[in-house]
């Protein structure tokens, strides 16, 4: 009995002295803000680019807004070997808990995405709240860009760009966790934000200084290019392969379907009704600005309902939108808005939003046959037994032919008597 009591006391005391297995002194770490991964398909080399900030340049444990960090790249046959080479060129321990963005080049997204995700999942220190970015060309070029008018680390700048600006629908944030969930969930394909760098090309700035240790081509230091960033569009995947880009309008259509909280301006024609009984391309607006209505979208949400009739699934998309009409309108008739005019404006706004939705459906259901919408996942969630019995193994084949109905309900809220028709003398 005494031995048992003594053993319990010893075991309970041990728990008071436990520590972190990966503990490191703050002064001995290199804070990683950006991680970029590229692939050279000519020789099957993987290039990893890390942007880090030395803790010696921080103030009181906080990173100064004016610190841009340093960008290093290493080339190897595997991801882990490239990271190890970067560790050899870094005085502090590489510390990924500050990671803001994971940037993947287009070739890497096409050929080695599975290896990238496997490495991320095996590295517990990498934050799954960091954003996944797909960029055309090379990730190392994006990471080594710095805004001369707002000199902060590119990873933090891109993160702020995606979070600090109201969602205009042309792109949206996707975290590592969300991206992996889309990869493993049934009936949905992955998407990720598209970010590009803008600015002038400068030969001197694009040159890289050689770093001692290893061969000169294995590890290099990037002198940062002056430029800025633009986030627009989305990258789409089928399984673990990158398959194409969504442009601004297609991304907006996908945002309507997914129920993203969109804050953006929307314009419609005043003198033409559009027939949406079949899939249609975008409306080409008349250059006459007198025939254009302008709205500001204040709220949006959607609901996807899947019905099964005689084993044939049907997708119903219901989108609700609230909008504000700009202060003046250019229609004919009464000086102030009448209920009939308001109803007509709401119908035109609904048709314009429906056009966005049908455009992205036409391309990705009918042409590329990739379920980036998650219709299959909604079928699985709403009818799990039928999904496993009839659709799980054949969804890719039947998805392009599934009928889709779209209903948009738009409400204009600011239609008081202060909204007057614009008179120009």
What residues fall within each predicted segment?
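Sec-dependent signal peptide recognition
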Residues: 2-10
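Membrane-proximal alpha-helical signals and transmembrane carboxylates
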Residues: 5-6, 15-425
